[in-house]
């Protein structure tokens, strides 16, 4: 990639998660901070690309069942109306590693990343006109979301997404590096 990750000072929460992640990474290197941030960045970009391409098959491979069902309904609604939602990432996303639950149980083990990104986001109708979303002045938007990632067959996928305000609890949730550690 031509552009590397955005460098910034990590938050206190991110430093605490990274310390716990170093312990978790001894058991599974995919939990290491650099590995999680790289995987989250790749996944975020791939999800945006697949959404822009209206590629439900690719989306299905990258997200959990509930999220896929919700997105599939939205894509079908766009198609029914003759609309296409276009999204394009502007620059690199900022990824903060803010949550960790690693007990060795694949059903509950997860990481949480906070994503801050700028996107060009608009809808094109059947006639090729660009439709603005209500309440927006232009096509450029900034998203701040908490993505919960889980693993399946050794690959991270998006289990859930919370918008900035609804995801704030993620910054308070317990950090668990292993089945024997329980740091609050």
How would you name each of these model-derived features?
Residues 6-96, 184:
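Core segments of small alpha/beta cavity-forming domains
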Residues 2-17, 110-112, 123-124, 130-184:
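Short beta-strand edge/turn micro-motifs at domain boundaries
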Residues 72-79, 99-107, 176-180:
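Short, charged low-complexity intrinsically disordered segments located at boundaries
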Residues 44, 51, 75, 79-82, ...:
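Conserved NTP-handling cores and scaffolds of large molecular machines
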Residues 70, 98, 103, 121, ...:
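Residues in flexible loops and secondary-structure boundaries
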Residues 83-127, 135:
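Surface-exposed, charged secondary-structure patches
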């Amino acid at each position: 990639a031509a552009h590397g990750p955005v460098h910034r000072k990590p938050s206190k929460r991110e430093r605490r998660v990274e310390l716990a992640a170093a312990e978790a990474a001894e058991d599974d290197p995919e939990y290491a901070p650099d590995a999680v941030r790289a995987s989250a960045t790749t996944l975020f970009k791939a999800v945006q690309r697949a959404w822009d391409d209206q590629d439900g098959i690719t989306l299905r491979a990258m997200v959990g069942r509930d999220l896929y069902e919700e997105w599939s309904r939205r894509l079908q609604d766009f198609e029914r109306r003759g609309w296409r939602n276009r999204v394009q990432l502007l620059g690199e996303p900022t990824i903060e590693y803010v949550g960790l639950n690693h007990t060795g149980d694949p059903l509950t083990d997860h990481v949480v990343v906070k994503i801050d990104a700028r996107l060009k986001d608009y809808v094109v109708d059947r006639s090729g006109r660009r439709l603005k979303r209500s309440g927006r002045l232009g096509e450029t938007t900034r998203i701040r979301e908490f993505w919960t990632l889980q693993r399946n067959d050794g690959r991270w996928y998006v289990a859930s997404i919370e918008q900035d305000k609804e995801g704030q609890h993620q910054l308070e949730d317990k950090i668990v590096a292993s089945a024997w550690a329980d740091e609050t």
